[in-house]
Amino acid sequence: MAEQVALSRTQVCGILREELFQGDAFHQSDTHIFIIMGASGDLAKKKIYPTIWWLFRDGLLPENTFIVGYARSRLTVADIRKQSEPFFKATPEEKLKLEDFFARNSYVAGQYDDAASYQRLNSHMNALHLGSQANRLFYLALPPTVYEAVTKNIHESCMSQIGWNRIIVEKPFGRDLQSSDRLSNHISSLFREDQIYRIDHYLGKEMVQNLMVLRFANRIFGPIWNRDNIACVILTFKEPFGTEGRGGYFDEFGIIRDVMQNHLLQMLCLVAMEKPASTNSDDVRDEKVKVLKCISEVQANNVVLGQYVGNPDGEGEATKGYLDDPTVPRGSTTATFAAVVLYVENERWDGVPFILRCGKALNERKAEVRLQFHDVAGDIFHQQCKRNELVIRVQPNEAVYTKMMTKKPGMFFNPEESELDLTYGNRYKNVKLPDAYERLILDVFCGSQMHFVRSDELREAWRIFTPLLHQIELEKPKPIPYIYGSRGPTEADELMKRVGFQYEGTYKWVNPHKL
């Protein structure tokens, strides 16, 4: 194996930036203003401010970039610094750079539905160096209930008249098809589609982005990536912790809206889509939309819903169930686990079940895509062979591995399960991978929308799940209880077995490399 040359974080992201621009220069001479709407909130202090700091520290932001925080709270830059700096992971050697970063920060207090507040924000931005000509990037780190008022006021009072204007919208993008359509229609009446960046941070993860390269840059996968060879596809998202005092927010949306309708469905698209004409943003998103249009609405008999209960043998939080969270409404029937089977009704995937599983308080932290292949025809090993699987492990410990049969070492001629393994932490141990938010925010500065959700994608995603969500809200079925720290309801395993997935339980991938 060739030795990897150590690359700094700046070099890695710089290469990415060069790829995004396809050789064009990154316009360091332009003035940019990055406006964080909702600057006093958790998302801002834990994710957005740290991400902007990392990009600034590594020289990846345009040279003349200013950061403006906006929220209702009467704060100062010192307050913002106190809240967010613990998440920066800054070293003592970066002290001067940190001072330079906060010197570029400012803060404006104002209401979200008050025109005068936005006029004051605009005056503040115009007063910055070349601020009236600056490119403006608005990050809506806000609850969706204020999106309409905020976007309307931004459009009326805060748009740059010379530079470009871009807006980043955080999920949830509505609660169902109808509310999503209303929000999309409102935002699209104010901004062009090329100005709107609907962010799903999973699309910024290394292994999710690797799906396209894995599929379309390797000849070996093309002939087998179809219904003739693949028996089923399993997309999994597991968290080993519960709501831990944040159940009030979660209860409003539930696990399907929180994870399945966005993260897992986006990964499904990348697995199932046809080869795009190019890596141009719209070429890629066109193919994703085609996949979604081939998926029918979820059928109730292909759904299992669960809710975690305390583990009597556990410790600490593990002893508490979802309903023990004081922020959760008493008697809530909101699901913390869901397993859903979808079918892509086209020539490539006809009859192949796509199984989406996600949940809280499960036995491990894991997100992965697993393709299970059909049994080998003409078995000569007396049913000792297990199905081959290709696994793309998104988190933790990014990896691609193929589960396959090899001869068991020794005197006997017996097959046993093993794997061909590419663990990123070992093969690329000197490469510093950018955080998902770093990659995506850099994409917005560069104007690349490939890893953002287009309005027609969003509409099709909600079309698939809205009837099920409405049925759940109307009938309020009681979710199946499962123990904190388990694999989830056994009924989910039974559903997967019914549609064709074979779970042997005899093999578990173990990271073979000390990271």
UniProtKB/Swiss-Prot annotation:
Mutagenesis or variant effect for residue 447 to R: In CNSHA1; Santiago de Cuba; class I
Active site: 263
Effect annotated for changing residue 410 to D: In CNSHA1; Japan; class I
Residues annotated with N6-acetyllysine modification: 89, 171, 403, 432, 497
Illness the protein is tied to: Anemia, congenital, non-spherocytic hemolytic, 1: An X-linked disease characterized by G6PD deficiency, acute hemolytic anemia, fatigue, back pain, and jaundice. In most patients, the disease is triggered by an exogenous agent, such as some drugs, food, or infection. Increased unconjugated bilirubin, lactate dehydrogenase, and reticulocytosis are markers of the disorder. Although G6PD deficiency can be life-threatening, most patients are asymptomatic throughout their life.
NCBIfam families: zwf
Name the UniProt record assigns to this protein: Glucose-6-phosphate 1-dehydrogenase
Organism (species): Homo sapiens (Human)
Lineage: Eukaryota, Metazoa, Chordata, Craniata, Vertebrata
